Amino acid sequence: MLSKRNLAMMLIMFGVVLVLFLSTAVMKEYFNDYDVNHAALEDRISREKSEFATGPRQHVVYVGAQDAGFYPPILEWAGYRKMSFYEAADVETGIAQADAYEKADAYLLLDGDALEQDTQQAAELLTAYVREGGTVIFCSLPDYQTIQGCDTLRQLLGIQKLRAESVELLEIWLYEGFLLGGEVCYAFDELQIPERIDMGREIPWYDISARTKSYMVGYVTAREKGDAGLSNEDMPAILWRSNTGNGCVFAVNGDYMEGEAALGLLDAMVYESREYALYAVVNAQNLSVAGFPTLTSENEEAFRQVYGFDSQQFCRDVIWPSLVAATESGGWKISAFLSVKQSNATAPEANMDFFTEYLKYYNEESAEAGIALGRKEDTDIRRSLTEEKAKLDSMDLTYAFTGGYIRSENEEQLSRLLKPDGSMDILPDMRTVVTEGGSEQAVFSWLTDQITRQSITVDGYQHTYMDNFRLKSLQTALGYSNVQADMYRVVWLEDRKDAWECVSEELAANIDTHWKPFAAFDKTTITESDRRVRIFLNERITSSISDTEAGRQITVQVENFNNEAWLMLRTHGEKPKSMEGGTWKRIEEDAYLLHLTSDTAAVVLQSDLENYYYEGM
């Protein structure tokens, strides 16, 4: 039987536990400064317009058409690397311009169509240029017949045999050590998910010589290979380097240089042609959730048929918890771009009390609240944004909206929101705008002198072969990605596959799996990323290597330095031994992320090999 004394002790213990529980909840609520955007507390970094202390150190000469798919990313790459850019109408003019620079500082980029006329003369000029130490990059190849008809061109490209004008591939292998992220096989057999296959599998079959190095190769079936008595070395080449004299030629067999993928390929080619590579990166991985939350019951009838309750409840009770669960293991930070109302056709009034709840959730999860700039198929985004801002102001909060998201159909209206000085009058705190991107839109850039633009780089609900290829390329070039989770698609679903239970499963699997090789890069909110983008766009990196008593030392200088900078260091068998002016971390073999805390830094390298030998130098 329970004594009075024991009963009293139990009641006291229950009381203490209850008080502790309630006090914890109260303290959590009290210290939750949810109406503060912590990412906006850092000062806004201004656009640097002053000239660099010295002229461009590196130069790009492009020979080809401006309507080629690789022309925009080449321009973008040259801008990111602070290189001078020169265009030439023909090979002879291009070589004359490239000859004005030191061979180690110039890159001659070619559209294969530029060699369709006067092929023999162009091939001879290019061969002489490469033998003297020049670096030539064929962004696309001349057509099969042109290569077949010119032995000098075949020798320059390192092609020993032309086997077929077109061959259907069973697999494409991208070997490790070129783009970051390790080796990968893109297979085309019946076991693969058809929706993921978006790489072309038919290419000309060029058999390259022993003086080349392959980075990406296609494979035919074992039967085809066996019947022809071929080995792996005879398989169709896609990306390779050919050495001639003191220089080298890079060749791309296919359309892989079109779009954002070109950025990483170009940096990888520079790395493969030099003793080491050192260049600026952003070091930011973003997850942008567009149109979340919606504070109004949208698409009510259809939504209740599919989910059983309205979109407001669904966002709060289903989507938010599953977003937190999906991002937890990878340490992702959510940037959620709210919409008071997603469509002008939506009749019900917004429940603004939900917004305060979300701000508390975000603060607990280190997430950031952004704002959607306009609505679905909006004819006047200025009017709708003014209405939404008035609703938010009625909450009497001090939260600074520094990140915005605009749908592609509304981008043409973006200028209506901008003041002459480049700021937004409706949202004066705005620092960066996320756009849905496109083949000719830069990964990021200055929208105005006050605001940056950051493009979506990948759809989080899918991961095709080309998505994977672009991801590896952008991580190689920029250490950057901006993953989109589109809630407009979920709320206004047109197909059962757009339902949250379907797309959320894909999102969780994709961001957990495909970003693992890039865990060294930081996860950021969109405003944290904006700060790093501004640092990247303003700065220029120069470096040199020399032998010292401590070992081979890379000396780094950063112009327009702003407290910190992130750099990619890629070596050939060496690794950092010590560093002054910053720290480093390993990304993968021969690839390191440097964090500079001074405008000058020095990295001493060490090698496990007694006699260091770099192939091709």
Language model segments and positions:
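Active-site beta->alpha N-cap acidic-glycine motif
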Residues: D255-Y361
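Aromatic-Pro/Gly-enriched surface loop or interdomain linker
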Residues: M9-K103, V281, L295, I319-W332, ...
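Short alpha-beta junction capping motif
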Residues: A100-G149, N246
